[in-house]
Amino acid sequence: MRKLILLCLLLSVSALAQNNSSFAQQRARHLRRGINLSEWFAQVYDPKGYTKEHLVGWVTADDVALIKSMGFDHVRLSINPAPMMHHNEADRIPGDYLGYLDGAVKMVLDHGLAVILDMHPDSDFKAKLVQRDDEVEQFSDFWRALAHHYSTYDPEMVYFEILNEPEFRDRYRWAGVQAKLAAAIRDGAPKHTIIAAGANWSDIDDLLELTPLSDLNVIYNFHFYDPHTFTHQGATWGENYWHFETKLAYPAEMHNAEQVASEQPDRLNRLRVLRYALDHWDANRIAVEIGQAAEWAKHWNVPLTCNEFGVYRRDSDPQDRARWIHDVRATLEHDGIGWNMWDYGARDDGGGFGVVNGPKEGPNTPDEVTVQALGLKH
């Protein structure tokens, strides 16, 4: 009798595990073509902060309708947890702020789009998680409360992303922290799918070092901006040589790279630009890089998405930018990986990473070259 009971128990556990795994695989199909919504509930650096005016007006119903009309099936909503967390009371989320977030989520869902609630704090917030266990405890309490709040929402349409680009250099500590945060989310929302990632910048190398969580109702994700020499040309943050780059071509061409390298102020940075051409960055190279992520997912039998990829618009040639976006998107789709481009670009005046030409005032309009590169229609 004991053997029979044990056998039944093992079969039940096995069936439950397969069911949870199939949930994640099935739900990943809702996340095929997405766009990031940034600078709304995160990345707000205006001294006024997260004001009511900003939260109710940065992205409008017209924007969400435009996203739907372009052919996207979901959005990734960046959320900075800091404005919602009070010291030692992280599980008590302010109702007014939560009300604005509820309004945003409802607006997205009302347009038939799924939404990823992407926890997207600043680097200082993440540094505390790296160094202090008490900060991890508070963040766990916050996640548990937020997940519980949204636990009544359709789990086919609402997803919880643990932490954007964790910036943990110690992948073993990140493994423990991620498992704890995932458990807190699961406590709050037993039926919803969680999105996890590798340590540090969540790139492919970080993904390859990741061992999947024991929770099977999880989708894994990575970010792809390789090579940054091309995708971040003209950027005023990050590596100092990016700022001096302009019109670096894609696919890589040595003659073009030599011209761009000549504008660098020192020899080391000139060599960094030349390496871009020497590494032969083209569609084949992109396929090889992303193929590693696809093989990792196949090995572990887990669903996988790419939740960020894109090219900074200000100093890149529009056609070269479109070619890179096309090649990344086509490779992801070939490998069965859902994607999320960075980003929508509301009111960035066409100078950021956006899929729209976002004026400071007035309606956003699709950037047709980018829309076509994404295989979408408008």
Where are the model-predicted features located?
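Aromatic-rich peripheral "rim/lid" segments of glycoside hydrolase catalytic domains that contact
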Residues: 315-378
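Structural motif corresponding to alpha-helix initiation and N-cap regions
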Residues: 57-61, 287-290, 322-325
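Active-site mouth of glycoside hydrolases
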Residues: 22, 27-193, 198-206, 217, ...
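Active-site region of glycoside hydrolase catalytic domains
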Residues: 21-25, 31, 137-282, 287, ...
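Hydrophobic h-region of N-terminal signal peptides that target proteins for export
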Residues: 9-17
